[in-house]
C-alpha cells in the first residue's frame, strides 16, 4: 500500500510531514513523493494551458511550479517516513532526481504514466538496480513493452492506471491487470484515481500486489489533487478493506481444511449404511446398502465388502463395519 503525497502539501513542508505521519497512521506500507523541477516537464509559455479537468485554465508551468516538492525537503521527508516504519521513495522525472535520491538510499523509483515513453529516464532509474514501478495510463502496449525492455533485468512493477482525475468506476478496465500479467508476468498493481472499494477488491482478486492512491489532509483544504485523493480516515478504511481482501485470497486448496467449523460438518457427509434389516448369514449385495448423510457409516469413497457374509443380524441404517462379516 503506497500513499502518494503529490502536491497535496500545498507548498508547505510542515503539511508534507503531516501527510507522512497520516500515511503511517492509516496503515500504508510506503509513502511516495514526486521529485522534479518545472523545467523538467514544461516551459513557461503563457499559451501552454491545461484544457479540462481539475486544473483547467492554468498554464503547465503554473501547475508544476505549485505542485513540486523541493529536493531540499527530501532528507527530512525520508527520515520522517523511516522513523514511522514507512518505505519512502519518489517519482522521478529527470536523471538528476535519481542522483539526488541515491544519496538518500532510495529503495525504489516510480515512473509516471506520462513519462513511460522516456526510455533514457527509465534506464537511468533501472541502472541503480532498485525496484522500478511504472504506471501505464495512456500508454500503448508498444510503449509498455519498450518501458519493460528499458528496465532490463532490474525488478519492476507495472501499475495499471487510468489517466483521469478522478477515474470513473466503469472506465477502470481492471481486466487490463490480467493482460499485463500474461504478457509481462508478476507483480502488477493499481495506481488508483477512483478509490472505490469494489474496484480495489476486484484488482486484488485479479492479481494486483501494489495499490497506490493519493493522500491528503482532512478537508477543507486547497490540496492540488483533492478531487482524486483520500482523507486519512478514508485511506485507513481502504487499507482495512485491502487487508481483508488479501486475507480472503488464501491459497488454492480442496478438501477438508483446518477450521474446527469445517470439521463440525463431518456428520453431514454421505456414508454407506444398511438399507434394511438383514439376517445372520446374509450375503451383502449392492441393494442392501444406501448412501445417506450420517455421522457413522462406511466411507463413501471406499469399495464395499460386497459378497461377504454377515456374521450376525444388522438393523436398517446401522453403519457397515468389517466386524459385521465372517
Regions found by a protein language model. Name each.
Residues 1-326:
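Catalytic cores and adjacent flexible loops of soluble metabolic enzymes
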Amino acid at each position: 500500500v503506497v500513499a502518494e503525497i503529490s502536491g497535496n502539501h500545498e507548498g508547505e513542508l510542515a503539511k508534507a510531514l503531516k501527510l507522512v505521519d497520516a500515511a503511517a497512521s492509516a496503515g500504508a506500507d510506503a509513502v511516495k513523493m514526486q521529485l522534479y523541477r518545472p523545467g523538467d516537464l514544461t516551459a513557461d509559455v503563457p499559451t501552454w494551458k491545461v484544457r479540462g479537468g481539475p486544473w483547467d485554465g492554468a498554464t503547465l508551468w503554473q501547475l508544476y511550479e505549485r505542485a513540486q516538492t523541493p529536493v531540499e525537503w527530501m532528507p527530512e521527508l525520508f527520515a520522517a517516513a523511516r522513523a514511522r516504519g514507512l518505505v519512502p521513495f519518489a517519482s522521478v522525472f529527470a536523471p538528476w532526481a535519481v542522483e539526488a535520491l541515491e544519496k538518500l538510499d532510495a529503495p525504489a523509483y516510480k515512473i509516471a504514466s506520462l513519462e513511460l515513453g522516456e526510455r533514457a529516464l527509465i534506464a537511468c532509474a533501472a541502472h541503480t538496480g532498485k525496484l522500478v514501478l511504472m504506471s501505464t495510463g495512456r500508454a500503448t502496449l508498444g510503449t509498455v513493452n519498450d518501458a519493460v525492455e528499458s528496465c532490463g533485468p532490474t525488478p519492476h512493477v507495472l501499475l495499471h492506471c487510468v489517466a483521469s482525475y478522478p477515474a470513473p468506476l466503469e472506465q477502470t478496465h481492471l481486466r487490463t491487470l490480467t493482460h499485463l500479467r500474461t504478457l509481462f508476468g508478476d507483480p502488477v498493481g493499481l495506481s488508483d484515481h477512483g478509490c472505490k472499494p469494489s474496484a480495489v477488491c476486484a484488482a486484488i482478486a485479479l492479481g494486483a500486489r501494489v495499490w497506490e492512491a493519493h493522500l491528503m489532509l482532512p478537508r477543507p483544504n486547497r490540496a492540488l489533487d483533492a478531487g482524486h485523493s483520500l482523507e486519512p480516515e478514508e485511506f485507513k478504511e481502504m487499507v482495512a478493506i485491502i487487508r481483508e481482501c488479501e486475507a480472503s485470497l488464501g491459497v488454492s486448496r480442496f478438501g477438508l481444511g483446518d477450521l474446527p467449523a469445517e470439521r463440525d460438518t463431518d456428520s453431514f457427509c454421505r456414508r454407506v449404511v444398511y438399507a434394511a434389516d438383514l439376517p445372520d448369514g446374509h450375503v451383502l449385495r449392492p441393494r442392501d446398502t444406501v448412501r445417506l448423510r450420517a455421522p457413522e457409516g462406511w466411507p463413501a469413497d471406499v469399495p464395499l465388502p460386497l459378497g461377504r457374509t454377515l456374521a450376525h443380524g444388522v438393523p436398517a441404517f446401522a453403519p457397515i463395519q468389517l466386524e459385521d462379516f465372517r
